[in-house]
């Protein structure tokens, strides 16, 4: 069997990967999507082709011999997007790290290098495979040289393989005659002119009959059609030049040796480190852990598995100033802990023998208590004030010269809230949460792992990731099979939490987010922990009854839809529904896709007012989702105590909003009555009621304050109906004569402006023309002139700094503002306009939550904060405490921020969430 060489067209495959994948970036903001896609294509092709040799060819910026022949060669090509351009040196660096032979040649294109190497290898008796997205390379196909062309159809990439015979079958000409076709028809991609009036069909007929442009020219008078004959007569010199431009040079003077091209071990340590830097976690699984960890496992860890040693270890930790802690848990079970006394003394404490879960968690709890106690004593001794409540003020962790104090005792962890599930503490100043700090410093990341933190904040330190230590094993499986890896994992987490504290604190200070961290996010950990532990009670019988109501209505809708359709069909099948609506019933406005008609909500919503069947289908979908998500889905979420304990996430959204999962209680429907009724299943325990407090139009009030628009501020100060006021101003009608429709439209504009809505978006929301929507927005900005300047200023600030900030200093990076892609850039501008407003509103609700939680606790009340949904707080309130809790909610929510317009709170009470809302 012949040896094989795989030849890769570097720029072509990189380009395909760039446009075929989402725009990926790593935590440093470096674009990586094209490199990631290239590597996946490369590795997959190697697995399929199994070559002995590999070479990747790239173009250079310098002009080639073709530019000397024709100055306008490739002159119509658009410049390479900057996001792609910056990845070219990156892929070359990666290939070099993998030991891949990379070849370039000044004056020649990658095609010429590939053609030369293909012919050279064929002459040596080898098989050659060329991978490229460029069909020009088909001219190189022979029985020994195969061209592989990736082709994307309906989002899926397949590969077309061409030897000489496949070229003939597809194009009716031999591979060398591909050049003749280009000579006649030209190539718009490369700006090869060809001859006027001859397209692919005519060119193919001519070459099939005459074989070459020279032979066709010799039989000029016989050429058909007439237009082609006259064009050949007048432009034969252009055809000859086009042929020369299209011909791939197969004897380029390049330096090449098969020794350098020999395919060796691609998974080198250098490649591993680069993959880590670029955050290609899926690719890291391909590397041999033992080989790549030689230089990364520098840290020495100790195991403490006896009671006496454990006592001594915790005594030492309590005597010290700072400790890093990690707890290894799964499904509520504790397997062990990592404890870093400093950056050299790091211990793993397994739960075994006399060291029980209760003992270990008790020692960690004691450590936190000791830290709190010590800090309190130091504060009293130094006669300093307690931490100030106002997030806009300086705090006691800062010296007068602006530097941070590090003399305070502290326990550091990657996720303090996860720690609090197993130990009790209520002192935010006793802990440092590296995960929350990392989120504040870069809120665009989807996860915050210890190895990422080490790389970013510990001078590029490379630590093995969890996957490298444990693979895909569960903690329990690792406990049984990979005890050493589990110990290392626990120690690395504890070490990273401790080591990252100082650089992260400095970064928070330098970015102006120290107060956001200490005054908002750090206390919030304890607030959310309390909410998760309390949970919210669910009435199972009511939930069952709700599900039955939904089932009845869904059944009624099903029959109505079938009756209107004239037949039974699967309403949950978009394909079947599309045929019924747009073919059988002949509804206008159908949008055909490759798989059938689109039945997306935005399509159907436009048709609903005119067609009752569509209105019924939309209701059917909404109710079916309600049933599966809530009526059925919530049943499995009810714990043994009869309550649902949702998880509240503070490190997910880029704007700073809190989200909830397992289950998501923030998406409880509010627009339709049957959706709102789900709130009836959430009830307080006996002797309690729900108090629900909701900020009124908080984002519009924030907009008024931040923009300083006098007219909007005055409207709020006069307690006017803000939407009616806007309608009156925008539509030039007296306040008392504003119609309901005008008020609804003004409301859409008011809230749309907050979210940076475009005229197109507003036209879709209001079912009006884009021109009308643009006029509404223009009139709005004429009414409130400072808002336009404020929003434009935010976009400019985002472009200049790369981020925008909330009123309290929270940053929101916006890399999209620098994108060469118009859609991405437009998205970035909308983000720049709405993030400071949304983010400030999110900060305010968090401050309010912290204040309410602390007041309830400090005043020893039985009532507790159990839920937060956007701008709404729900308190499970002891009936005897209703007046006191109402006053606390009113005072703390209104006092959470000082705005030029007063914050307003709507408050209701009820025996279930539905009644309270």
Please provide the spans of the model-predicted regions.
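Extended two-metal-dependent nuclease catalytic cores across DNA- and RNA-processing enzymes
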Residues: 2, 22-26, 75-254
């Amino acid at each position: 069997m012949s040896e094989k060489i795989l030849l890769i067209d570097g720029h072509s495959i990189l380009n395909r990967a760039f446009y075929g994948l989402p725009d990926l970036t790593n935590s440093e903001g470096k674009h990586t999507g094209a490199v990631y896609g290239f590597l996946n294509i490369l590795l997959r092709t190697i697995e399929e082709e199994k070559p002995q040799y590999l070479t990747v060819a790239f173009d250079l910026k310098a002009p080639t011999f073709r530019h000397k022949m024709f100055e306008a060669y490739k002159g119509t090509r658009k410049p390479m997007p900057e996001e792609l351009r910056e990845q070219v040196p990156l892929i070359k660096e990666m290939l070099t790290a993998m030991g891949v032979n990379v070849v370039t040649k000044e004056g020649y294109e990658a095609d010429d290098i590939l053609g030369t190497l293909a012919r050279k290898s064929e002459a040596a008796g080898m098989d050659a495979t060329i991978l490229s997205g460029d069909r020009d390379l088909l001219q190189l196909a022979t029985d020994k040289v195969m061209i592989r062309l990736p082709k994307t159809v309906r989002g899926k990439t397949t590969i077309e393989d061409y030897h000489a015979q496949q070229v003939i079958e597809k194009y009716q000409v031999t591979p060398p005659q591909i050049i003749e076709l280009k000579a006649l028809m030209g190539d718009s991609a490369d700006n090869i002119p060809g001859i006027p009036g001859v397209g692919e069909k005519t060119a193919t007929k001519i070459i099939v009959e005459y074989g070459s442009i020279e032979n066709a020219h010799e039989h000029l008078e016989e050429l058909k059609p007439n237009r082609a004959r006259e064009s050949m007569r007048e432009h034969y010199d252009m055809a000859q030049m086009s042929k020369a431009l299209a011909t791939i040079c197969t004897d380029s003077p390049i330096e090449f040796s098969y020794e350098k091209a020999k395919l060796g071990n691609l998974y080198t340590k250098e490649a591993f480190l680069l993959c880590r830097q670029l955050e290609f976690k899926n690719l890291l699984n391909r590397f041999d852990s033992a080989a790549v960890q030689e230089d990364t496992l520098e840290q020495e860890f100790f195991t403490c598995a006896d009671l006496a040693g454990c006592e001594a270890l915790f005594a030492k930790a309590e005597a010290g100033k700072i400790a890093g802690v990690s707890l290894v848990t799964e499904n509520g079970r504790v397997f062990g802990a990592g404890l870093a006394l400093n950056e050299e003394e790091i211990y793993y404490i397994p739960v075994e023998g006399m060291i029980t879960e209760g003992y270990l968690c008790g020692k960690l709890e004691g450590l936190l208590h000791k830290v709190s106690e010590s800090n309190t004593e130091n504060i009293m001794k130094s006669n300093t004030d307690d931490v100030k409540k106002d997030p806009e003020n300086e705090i006691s962790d800062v010296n007068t010269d602006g530097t941070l104090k590090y003399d305070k005792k502290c326990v550091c962890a990657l996720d303090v809230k996860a720690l609090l599930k197993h130990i009790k503490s209520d002192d935010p100043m006793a802990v440092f949460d590296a995960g929350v700090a990392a989120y504040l410093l870069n809120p665009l990341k989807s996860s915050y792992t210890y190895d990422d933190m080490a790389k970013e904040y510990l001078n590029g330190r490379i630590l093995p990731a969890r996957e490298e230590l444990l693979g895909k094993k569960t903690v329990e499986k690792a406990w049984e099979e990979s005890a050493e890896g589990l110990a290392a994992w626990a120690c690395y987490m504890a070490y990273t939490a401790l080591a990252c504290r100082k650089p992260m604190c400095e970064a928070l200070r330098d970015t102006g987010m120290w107060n956001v961290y200490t005054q908002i996010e750090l206390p919030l950990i304890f607030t959310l922990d309390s909410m998760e532990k309390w949970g919210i009670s669910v009435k199972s019988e009511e939930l069952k009854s709700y599900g039955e109501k939904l089932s009845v209505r869904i059944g009624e809708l099903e029959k109505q839809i079938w009756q209107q359709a004239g037949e039974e069909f699967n309403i949950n099948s978009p394909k079947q529904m599309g045929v019924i609506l747009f073919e059988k019933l002949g509804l206008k406005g159908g949008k055909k896709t490759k798989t059938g008609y689109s039945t997306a909500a935005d399509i159907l919503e436009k048709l609903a007012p005119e067609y009752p069947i569509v209105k019924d289908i939309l209701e059917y979908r909404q109710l079916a989702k309600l049933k599966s998500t809530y009526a059925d889905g919530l049943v499995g979420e009810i714990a043994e105590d009869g309550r649902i304990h949702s998880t509240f996430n503070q490190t997910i959204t880029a704007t700073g909003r809190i989200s909830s999962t397992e289950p998501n209680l923030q998406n409880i429907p509010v627009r339709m009555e049957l959706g709102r009724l789900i709130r009836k299943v959430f009830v307080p325990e006996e002797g309690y009621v729900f108090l629900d407090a909701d900020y009124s139009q908080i984002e519009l009030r924030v907009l008024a304050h931040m923009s300083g628009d006098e007219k909007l501020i005055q409207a709020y100060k006069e307690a006017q109906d803000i939407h009616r006021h806007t309608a009156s101003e925008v539509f030039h009608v007296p306040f008392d004569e504003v119609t309901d429709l005008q008020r609804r439209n003004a409301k859409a504009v008011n809230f749309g402006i907050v979210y940076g809505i475009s005229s197109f978006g507003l036209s879709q929301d209001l079912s009006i023309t884009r021109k009308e929507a643009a006029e509404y927005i223009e009139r709005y900005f004429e009414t409130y002139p400072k808002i336009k300047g404020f929003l434009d200023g935010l976009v400019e600030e985002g472009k200049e700094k790369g981020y925008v900030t909330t009123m309290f200093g929270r940053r929101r990076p916006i890399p999209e503002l620098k994108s060469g892609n118009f859609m991405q850039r437009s998205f970035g501008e909308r983000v720049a306009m709405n993030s400071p407003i949304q983010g400030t509103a999110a900060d305010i609700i968090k401050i309010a939550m912290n204040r309410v939680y602390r007041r309830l606790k400090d005043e020893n009340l039985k009532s507790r904060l159990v839920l937060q949904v956007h701008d709404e707080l729900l308190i499970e309130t002891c009936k005897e405490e209703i007046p006191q809790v109402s006053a606390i909610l009113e005072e703390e929510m209104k006092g959470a921020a000082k705005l030029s317009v007063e914050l307003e709170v709507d408050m209701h009470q009820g025996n279930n969430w539905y009644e309270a809302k």
